[in-house]
Amino acid sequence: MSQAAKFRELLASRKMIVAPGAIDGLTGRLIDQAGFPAAYMTGAGTSMTLGYPDYGLITMTEMVANATRIVNSISMPLISDSDTGYGNELNVFRTVQEFERVGVAAIHIEDQVFPKKCGHLDSKELVSREDYIAKIRAAAAARKSKDFCIIARTDSRAVVGFEEAIERANSALANGADIAFVEAPQTMAEVEAVPKRVKGPCLLNVVRGGKTPEIELADAERMGYAIAILPGLLLGGIISVCDQLLADVKRDGKQPPVVSGLPGKTFARFGAAIWDERRTAFRDVIKVAAE
């Protein structure tokens, strides 16, 4: 069964899918080992691993390459950010083909102008509703398998208001999207209203310190959200821990005791035993042939 088909099964279960954000194969593997049903490739995290802010500076090729590394490191479905689709509806068509080809289960496409910026920043700009819907229709037409999910993200709440966000979400669902993603609702009343007023499954972006009020995952599920992504969960933790470790070493001149040893057990978590078995098997074949 494809990961896209597995993702469809998760959606059909009516249990909210919680997908922490992965920025690379390492964090994807950790999410998998922690037992989550899906992972989410964050565009912000991908940008930051390349040394850039979330300002739309990363190309489609770079995003697909990172998604490929994560897909190859996990055993569960990957939802991926695909920003604006990297151009107009023709670019979106190719974007869908590329993400689907490497085994991603679902992508979200947004209605910001290109280049975009993080959905929880100010001064965003939107394309027209007509241009947005053209992209969604192109995305739905481009996929080879109907299991591959198109998530329609709208950033219109911050630019033209909540009502336009609801209208764009419903229009996207009516034109081929499978899931709606109203980015950055600004009050708890708006958070609760989205799954009530949108005519299809809804995704909630859980961003600490962003425009949306903090919410417990159980409350999001009670409100009716189908998916909750946590893009900054590991990214924020990595930055905080790295800053602290670097400060400790600079101050004390030695590694703190909390640092895990390498290689040993750490490599084992990333498949060392499997690769050892393969090498032994290949060499055993040579020995048998020589005899």
Q: Where do the language-model regions lie?
A:
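Alpha/beta enzyme core
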Residues: 2-233, 237, 244-247, 282-291
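Flexible C-terminal active-site loop/helix
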Residues: 249-291
